[in-house]
Amino acid sequence: MKLVFAGTPEVAVPALDALIASGRHEVAAVVTRPDAPAGRGRRLVASPVAQRAEEAGIEVLKPVKPRDEEFLARLREIAPDCCPVVAYGALLPRVALDIPAHGWVNLHFSLLPAWRGAAPVQHSIMAGDEITGASTFLIEEGLDSGPVFGTVTEEIRPTDTSGDLLTRLAFAGSGLLVATMDGVEEGKLKAVPQPADGITLAPKITVENAHVDWSTPALRVDRVVRGCTPAPGAWTVFRGERLKLIQVVPVPERTDLAPGALSVGKNNVYVGTGSYAVELLWVQAQGKKPMRAADWARGVRITDGEPLGA
């Protein structure tokens, strides 16, 4: 089939690579978000998908809005059979959805109808799910509500951050997306409506969502830190300044600390929660590089019992 691939961040690149490597489908063009400022100099930089497409000699379309008439006209000229989508980053209007003969097929990083929305991986970790996966579905105007072509499952490991899990899902999902394109072309793959039960929503994680509440249980604190790593980054407050929490580990045997209270050993830093303590392993103070929590604690000379979050 002739395809137009829509995607923007690094997590979409494995799927683009898989479609190119399949040899069965022609990726005639790529649709991605416009160049964005990046780095200290805030220079405009093309998206990872745009960079990969340019390396492969594929036409790149960067509409400010996917309803722009110039973009729609070019899409009609290309006349794609299907448009696979991975983390494009903009809502597609009905006029665009109607152009490809077989519609737009999205690779979503959850087992739909669970975790519809922008941050399914973060929410699955923060909720304590043990299994997640990826789904391919036909895009409709509703939020991730279209009928599903196929799924692949992935175990959530106890130490997974959202970055770890998303990387694995990006590669597992790329194979699923290629298989879905093959099935659509053959006419043998039928999309199945999502069940009405089991719908959960996964809105974008805000900075406030990433603020750690030390009165919650240790397992919840651990899940928030892992779910918000690498972005937006879990955080707390220490001596009036924000402290980023990069890695913690629950310590069930430490039940002597009040929520938010610090305890410093020779090479360990513990914090009380609503259940038992967690050990801080890696942190990042404002304006500083990430460092081991024990090194940070020595540098700021913590007093036992000093609070976090105040």
From Swiss-Prot:
Q: Which amino acids does the record list as binding (6S)-5,6,7,8-tetrahydrofolate?
A: 110-113
Q: Which reaction does it catalyse?
A: L-methionyl-tRNA(fMet) + (6R)-10-formyltetrahydrofolate = N-formyl-L-methionyl-tRNA(fMet) + (6S)-5,6,7,8-tetrahydrofolate + H(+)
Top enzyme class: transferase
Query: What EC identifiers does the entry list?
Result: 2.1.2.9
Q: Pfam families recorded for this chain? A: Formyl_trans_C, Formyl_trans_N
Q: Name one GO cellular component term.
A: cytosol
| An example molecular function term from Gene Ontology annotations | methionyl-tRNA formyltransferase activity
Kindly state which keywords UniProt assigns to this record, in alphabetical order.
Protein biosynthesis, Transferase
Family label: Belongs to the Fmt family.
Q: Which HAMAP family match?
A: Formyl_trans (MF_00182)
| Known role | Attaches a formyl group to the free amino group of methionyl-tRNA(fMet). The formyl group appears to play a dual role in the initiator identity of N-formylmethionyl-tRNA by promoting its recognition by IF2 and preventing the misappropriation of this tRNA by the elongation apparatus.
* UniProt protein name: Methionyl-tRNA formyltransferase
